[in-house]
């Protein structure tokens, strides 16, 4: 079997059934072991973690097989039970790296339909201006995640029907990448419905040193729930 070098991460207090440890992974498949005490009995569990490190400077290394997924509008990691892909916490853009441009975090506790990744769609960046990745030339797949949650604040109008529905559908915006328009007037609520998950995928040929995604308000607000960048070749 596999042989692992043990390294203790110390002890942490449990708060609301959660204990947080900082684990400095040094291999691509580390084994995490946890041990505790329950009613006088020692209990333990373990899991082998599969991960690919993402460099801060995306131009500093070869990005073959890069798959960078971001939990937009959230400071939390999220791992999908379906794909097992981990979505990283959001961050502001800095030169040479990646991140959002403009907007504010917003979240909802309303159940999101048409997805098994509800928590991923319950956070967003409202009023977002753009998202940028400073990556080498190549062909990339960009996936954008949307859920119109804004009728939560118009609950009475929404329950009454058409008036609330119309207010949400006013959230319409365009999307461009490196100056080229991909969507003229995208309305997530019109396409998928209120609090319904929607994913959009685009193949981008990047002939510069960056992928600069911009959102252009047509009516209402621009928002983004998640984004994934995958290097194709």
Can you annotate each of these PLM segments?
Residues 50-233:
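Compositionally biased, intrinsically disordered or flexible polar/acidic segments
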Residues 22-28, 205-207:
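Surface-exposed, short loops/turns at beta-strand junctions within beta-sandwich domains
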Residues 25-31, 151-155:
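Short glycine/proline/serine/threonine-rich loop/turn segments at secondary-structure transition edges
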Residues 6-11, 43, 180-185:
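Surface-exposed loop/edge segments in extracytoplasmic proteins
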Residues 1-4:
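Short, small-residue-biased leader/transition segments that mark boundaries at the very start
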Residues 40-54:
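Edge beta-strands of extracellular beta-sandwich domains
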Residues 10-20, 194-198:
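Aromatic sugar-binding surface patches on proteins
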Residues 29-38, 211-216:
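Short, aromatic- and glycine-rich surface loops/edge beta-strands on solvent-exposed regions
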């Amino acid at each position: 079997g596999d042989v692992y070098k043990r390294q203790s991460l110390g002890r942490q207090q449990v708060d609301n059934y959660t204990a947080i440890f900082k684990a400095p992974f040094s291999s691509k498949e580390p084994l995490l072991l946890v041990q505790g005490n329950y009613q006088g009995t020692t209990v333990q569990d373990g899991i082998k973690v599969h991960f690919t490190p993402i460099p801060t400077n995306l131009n500093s290394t070869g990005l073959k097989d890069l798959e960078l997924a971001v939990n937009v509008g959230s400071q939390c990691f999220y791992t999908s039970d379906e794909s097992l892909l981990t979505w990283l916490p959001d961050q502001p853009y800095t030169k040479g790296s990646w991140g959002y441009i403009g907007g504010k975090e917003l979240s909802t506790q309303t159940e999101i339909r048409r997805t098994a990744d509800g928590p991923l769609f319950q956070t967003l960046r409202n009023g977002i201006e753009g998202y940028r990745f400073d990556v080498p030339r190549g062909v990339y797949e960009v996936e954008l995640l949307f859920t119109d949650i804004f009728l939560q604040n118009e609950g009475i109008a929404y329950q009454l029907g058409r008036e609330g529905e119309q207010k949400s559908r006013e959230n319409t915006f365009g999307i461009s990448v490196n100056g080229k328009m991909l969507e003229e007037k995208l309305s997530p609520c019109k396409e998928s419905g209120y609090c319904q998950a929607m994913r959009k995928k685009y193949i981008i040929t990047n002939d510069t040193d960056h992928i600069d995604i911009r959102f252009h308000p047509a009516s209402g607000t621009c928002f983004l729930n998640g984004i994934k960048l995958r290097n194709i070749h």
